C-alpha cells in the first residue's frame, strides 16, 4: 500500500473536516486487541484472553502488535504506516467484563474467544446483590485494583524505555471510566430475561437495583478520575446501554432514562454535548435522547 498517497488524502480530509466542508464522509473503524487474540493467523502462540487480562506484559505485547496491525493493514481515514506512528499507547483492557465483575459476577473465559460474565443471581438470590456495599465504599477494589496495577506497570515500562520495533510507549490510557449502562449491567447480573420481566412484575426491586448500579458507576468513575488527576465532573460524558434495545420507548423513558440523567448530572457539567453508544435497532430512542 502507498501510505504516503493515502496519508496525503487523509490530511486533506481532516483539514476539510476542521473547516466543516468535508468532500465525503470519512471512514472510521472501531477496533480493539481482541482482533489479534481471536485470529489464529495473528495469534500463533494461542494466547488466551485469561492470560491477556491477568498478565500485563502479555497485554502490552498484544497491544503493540495490535497497533502495528491497525497501522499497516486496516485501511481507514487515518494516518497509516507503522513508520508514521509516533508512539504506542497501551491501556488496561478488560473488554466488557469489568463492570459485571465489579458487582459480583464471575468472569467466564473461553480460550481465545471473547470473555463474558456469568449471571450471579436468580429470582431467589437477587436481593443479596443489594447487600454488597463494596462497589460503593471501595470503588477502587477488586478487579479495578488489578486495572490500576496494570496502568502502573505500563507507566513503569515507559519510564524504563520500553520500545516496540523502535516505537516508544506513550502515556498509558486512563481506562475503567464510562459505563456499559445501568440496564445492560442489570442484564449481566440477573440475566436479560429476568431483568426485562422484573421491570413489570417486580418493579420496586428493579428500581432499587438500577439505582444501586448507577450509584456504583458514579462512585467508580469519580474515584478513578481522582486517581488519574482528573476533575470529578468532566465537561461532557458519554456512555453505552445496549440492552435498552430490548425495551419499548415508553418503558425506557419511564424507567431507565431517569438513571441516565442521574449519571449525566453527577459526572459532567454539561458544558459540552454528551453522547450515547447503542447497538441494535435503537432509532426509536433517538428523538427522546436528543431532547
Give residue spans per PLM region.
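Low-complexity, flexible helical/coil segments
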Residues: 62-69, 114-122, 209-212
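Generic hydrophobic/packing signal
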Residues: 63, 72-74, 78, 119-129, ...
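A contiguous, low-structure linker/loop signature
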Residues: 84-130
Amino acid at each position: 500500500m502507498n501510505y504516503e498517497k493515502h496519508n496525503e488524502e487523509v490530511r486533506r480530509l481532516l483539514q476539510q473536516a476542521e473547516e466543516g466542508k468535508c468532500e465525503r464522509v470519512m471512514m472510521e473503524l472501531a477496533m480493539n486487541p481482541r482482533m489479534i487474540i481471536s485470529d489464529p493467523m495473528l495469534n500463533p502462540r494461542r494466547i488466551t484472553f485469561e492470560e491477556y487480562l491477568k498478565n500485563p506484559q502479555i497485554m502490552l505485547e498484544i497491544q503493540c502488535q495490535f497497533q502495528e496491525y491497525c497501522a499497516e493493514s486496516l485501511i481507514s481515514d487515518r494516518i497509516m504506516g507503522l513508520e508514521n506512528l509516533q508512539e504506542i499507547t497501551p491501556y488496561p483492557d478488560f473488554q466488557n467484563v469489568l463492570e459485571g465483575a465489579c458487582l459480583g459476577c464471575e468472569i467466564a473465559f473461553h480460550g481465545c474467544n471473547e470473555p463474558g460474565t456469568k449471571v450471579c443471581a436468580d429470582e431467589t438470590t437477587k436481593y443479596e446483590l443489594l447487600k454488597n456495599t463494596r462497589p460503593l465504599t471501595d470503588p477502587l477494589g477488586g478487579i479495578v485494583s488489578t486495572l490500576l496495577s496494570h496502568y502502573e506497570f505500563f507507566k513503569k515500562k515507559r519510564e524504563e524505555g520500553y520500545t516496540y520495533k523502535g516505537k516508544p510507549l506513550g502515556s498509558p490510557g486512563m481506562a475503567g471510566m464510562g459505563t456499559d449502562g445501568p440496564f445492560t449491567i442489570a442484564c449481566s447480573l440477573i440475566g436479560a430475561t429476568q431483568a426485562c420481566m422484573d421491570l413489570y412484575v417486580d418493579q420496586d426491586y428493579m428500581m432499587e437495583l438500577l439505582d444501586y448500579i448507577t450509584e456504583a458507576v458514579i462512585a467508580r468513575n469519580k474515584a478513578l478520575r481522582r486517581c488519574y488527576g482528573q476533575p470529578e465532573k468532566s465537561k461532557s460524558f458519554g456512555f453505552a446501554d445496549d440492552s435498552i434495545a430490548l425495551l419499548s420507548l415508553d418503558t425506557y423513558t419511564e424507567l431507565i432514562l431517569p438513571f441516565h440523567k442521574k449519571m449525566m448530572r453527577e459526572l459532567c457539567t454539561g458544558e459540552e454535548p454528551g453522547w450515547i453508544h447503542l447497538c441494535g435497532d435503537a432509532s426509536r430512542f433517538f428523538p427522546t435522547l436528543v431532547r
